């Protein structure tokens, strides 16, 4: 895993760009609703100031009838704005639900498609449980990031900017007091937030490691029982689980302490602003503001409410930052999977149906009993056809899973059509490795492998593998009917062909004794057989 200490820079930018690619029309509309909702939630202080100012104006004359139209108009405007905010909030929530679930669906599709393009080497060198964690834990953190953290962070940021502008309009002196307190809050946020970010990413890695361990033990449970290895396995799990516990505790310890600290700092700041406003009022100090209004009760009271709202949203920003950091850790892991290099294929020789005409092989569209290698020649544009016979020859082959450590050196052998060749040797001698090389699951370091006289590097991998039959050491069954599993190697095979294959394998009698015969649905890996 790359970047084990922190998420890559640019992960958020890449995620947002991808969301816009998924929903180029809906996402901007949702953003408009979010902005509208945030702006409306920020302006009640303006109406409060105006209403208090009207009350102050008519306090001396007690002419409340004259004040009523103005107050009524302000209240009605506020009601309309709140109704608009309610509609915008509903629209953005509904839209974000569509964007979130749709984006996760497309993200899973991207991940699965990329996984299908990865070479066998990737799955041999990565824990399967950790790979599964991409689809479960990391996708879930991404869901929280898209559906909750980013919208709430955007709303809080817009609210902070709007309230800051209103404060600047009413009183720069009181705003200066607020900014001093907020600066201290930012210092605390940066200190605590940076620590939690580091541990949130480590927590994601530890989750993948734990899931990988559990998956590994589940697959090897029989081996654990046979060797009475339960006690040691429990100790190994406790070690992995303790690591996850430690990383989770560290991450959440920093994250959970932040909000209470900021709330209490906000309460203290509220009292300080109230004292500062009272002292300025009593001293008759001139007000410095963009509005040009003198400092009065109609400004001080709304300013106190704005201070509480301002600090609350600063706290929300800080709180959401932790969620964003955790979500970005999951997104970074997902992008690391999407960025894995796919399996390359430079082959151009393909496998086609063929028939004989005038003693020569020609390509045909109908199914025949003859297969041929179609070999285009770029030099003169000609195409030649070579009958598929199964002649396999290895000449002076060198190979190593690690380029620095060669495990096969100067291997030469051949298998003629119809010839049976057995590889006998100790575990790790290279028996399976040779079959992997013929299938081009791995590429050789030196030498040549020829198939019907053609260098296998020139044959497209899909056609090469389609021409070969492999019986794996471990039985792999997929969820579906018995018939569908037999048909897996030839999707257009008829039921009669599948039954014939089962007879050849000696499985027909066993299959017919199943509850639904060939239509019996089996679970993955045949756990219900």
Model-derived regions: residue spans:
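Membrane-integrated ABC transporters
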Residues: 1-41, 55-74, 92-96, 100, ...
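An intracellular "coupling" helix at the cytosolic face of ABC transporter transmembrane type-1 domains
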Residues: 21-24, 120-121, 139-146, 150, ...
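Transmembrane helices of ABC transporter permease
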Residues: 22, 26-39, 148-201, 275-295
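Transmembrane helix-loop-helix hairpins at lipid-water interfaces of multipass membrane proteins
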Residues: 25-91, 168-173, 275, 283-294
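Alpha-helical segments in transporter systems
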Residues: 25-50, 74, 78, 93-97, ...
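Helix-loop-helix
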Residues: 58-59, 166-180, 254-332, 337-341, ...
């Amino acid at each position: 895993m790359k970047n084990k200490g922190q998420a890559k820079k640019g992960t958020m930018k890449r995620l947002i760009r991808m969301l816009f690619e998924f929903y180029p029309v809906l996402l901007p509309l949702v953003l408009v609703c979010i902005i509208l909702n945030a702006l409306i939630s920020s302006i009640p202080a303006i109406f409060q100031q105006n209403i208090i100012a009207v009350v102050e104006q008519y306090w001396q004359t007690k002419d409340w009838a004259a004040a009523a139209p103005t107050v009524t108009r302000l209240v009605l405007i506020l009601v309309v704005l709140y109704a608009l905010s309610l509609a915008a909030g509903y629209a953005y929530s509904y839209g974000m639900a569509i964007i979130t679930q749709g984006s996760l669906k497309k993200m899973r599709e991207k991940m699965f498609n990329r996984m299908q393009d990865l070479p066998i080497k990737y799955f041999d060198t990565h824990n399967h449980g950790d790979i599964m964690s991409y689809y479960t834990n990391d996708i879930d953190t991404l869901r929280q990031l898209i559906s909750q953290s980013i919208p709430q962070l955007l709303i809080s940021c817009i609210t902070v900017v709007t309230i800051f502008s209103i404060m600047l309009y009413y009183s720069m002196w009181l705003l200066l007091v607020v900014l001093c307190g907020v600066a201290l809050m930012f210092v605390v946020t940066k200190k605590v937030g940076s620590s939690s970010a580091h541990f949130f990413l480590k927590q994601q890695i530890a989750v993948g490691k734990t899931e990988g361990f559990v998956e590994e033990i589940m697959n090897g449970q029989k081996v654990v029982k046979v060797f009475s290895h339960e006690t040691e396995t429990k100790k190994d799990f406790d070690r992995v689980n303790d690591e996850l516990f430690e990383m989770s505790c560290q991450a959440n310890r920093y994250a959970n302490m932040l909000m209470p600290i900021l709330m209490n700092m906000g309460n203290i700041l509220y009292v300080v602003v109230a004292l500062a406003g009272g002292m300025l009022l009593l001293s008759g100090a001139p007000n410095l503001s963009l509005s040009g209004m003198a400092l009065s009760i109609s400004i001080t009271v709304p300013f106190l409410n704005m201070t509480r709202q301002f600090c609350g949203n600063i706290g929300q920003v800080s709180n959401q930052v932790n969620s964003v950091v955790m979500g970005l850790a999951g997104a970074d892991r997902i992008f690391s999977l999407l960025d894995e290099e796919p399996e390359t294929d430079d082959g151009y020789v393909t496998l086609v149906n063929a028939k004989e005409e005038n003693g020569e092989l020609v390509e045909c569209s109908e199914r025949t009993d003859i297969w041929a290698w179609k070999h285009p020649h770029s030099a003169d544009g000609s195409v030649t056809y070579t009958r598929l016979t199964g002649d396999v020859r290895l000449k002076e082959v060198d190979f190593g899973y690690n380029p620095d450590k060669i495990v096969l050196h100067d291997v030469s052998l051949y298998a003629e059509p119809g010839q049976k060749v057995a590889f006998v040797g100790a575990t790790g001698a290279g028996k399976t490795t040779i079959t992997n090389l013929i299938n081009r699951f791995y590429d050789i370091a030196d030498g040549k492998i020829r198939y019907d006289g053609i260098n296998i590097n020139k044959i497209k991998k899909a056609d090469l593998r389609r021409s070969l039959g492999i019986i794996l050491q471990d039985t792999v069954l997929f969820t579906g009917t018995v018939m569908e599993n037999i048909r897996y190697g030839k999707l257009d095979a008829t039921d009669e062909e599948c039954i014939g294959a089962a007879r050849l394998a000696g499985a027909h009698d066993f299959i017919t004794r199943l509850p639904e015969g060939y239509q019996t649905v089996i679970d993955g890996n045949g756990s219900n057989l």
